[in-house]
Amino acid sequence: MAQDPIFQNLEQVHTYGSPLGSRAKSLSEAMKGFRLGTSGPKTLQPNLERNGYTFFVRPQLNLSAKNCLRVRQLFRLLTDKVNSIPTFCRTTLDPRLYITPSENCRTSLIDNDNPFIPILTNCCVSVSGWPDLTTPSWTSSEGMRREAYSIVDGVMENYEAFDLDVSFFNMQDEPISQLFYTWEKYATLVFEGKCHPYPDFIAFNEIDYNTRIYRLVMDKTDTYVSKIACCGIAYPISLPSGDYANFRQDTPLEAKKDITIRFRCLGAVYYDDIALQEFNETVRQFNERLDTEVSEGMLGSKSSSFYQVPVEHRQAFSFLLPYIDINTLELKWYADLSKPENKVAYDYLNKLKESEYYKPMQGVLADVQPKIINQTGAREVLV
């Protein structure tokens, strides 16, 4: 009498005890050949991804005192209160002010080593308007029997101008509205000739109010970058300013929850690994010590001044810097241990690990291993 098979796990049940076949190998089997009657969505797992992150690169405006004194609308930026919203807007949009003692802009509201604008990433609600890639084609005119032929006639890359609508959570005191007003007002003042960019931007004929928007789509564990997209350059072109002046007697107290800013973008980059490299280069340009450690291969080592924060400890640290591992596509978050807040958290976690109460992270995120990614950044299919 044949003995009933004993299955050790659920995967063996699907593989040997079910006509649907293996769930783990369903992708490779769908690629390899036809499975009549048993293939399709029943065994193939859906593509699960997280929304990920939206990063906005800081522009390089010239908001020095000399420029601000040229126009009365910028007078409000020249406050002696370092930790105020006007100083935050001024230093965020002009990183050079932070290291200029005479400008009195060493505010604790920003991390000047961060190339991105954290408040926009943290408060981003939605981004819409990215164009699709298309293949241009040309079709001949019809012949006597209405026959025609068609060929590819163009490039697939998108270098066109398009608009992105980005919605942000509108918090108390409206720092985002003030930030974009300063940004857009400065751009128009440069056009009028009332404000002047920094001399190096004039010498190299560069535009200083441009930014770049990065979209990072993450895997279901929020560990690896599944897709990356970015525009060539972008700059804001709208500011919802008329709505706050409207009036209705039946709504004396109304919450302005979201604010939508339109960006004019030039070019869209998809499925191009150069976006990964440019993302990292942006981070390195704003942080000389990080750039040095990457060049010398020290980043992530024991002698590094940057600590790679694991997933379960990210909320314990401040001023984290994102950096993409080109080989594995892992989005790593580094804490600068030269900052007192991060050093305190780092020392506390080390003491916690030595105690008997410390338990390593368990669950789905603990099972994520870099070995599933090869050196080209492509996920290996289980066969």
Regions flagged by a language model, labelled:
Residues 1-383:
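Glycine-rich, low-complexity intrinsically disordered segments
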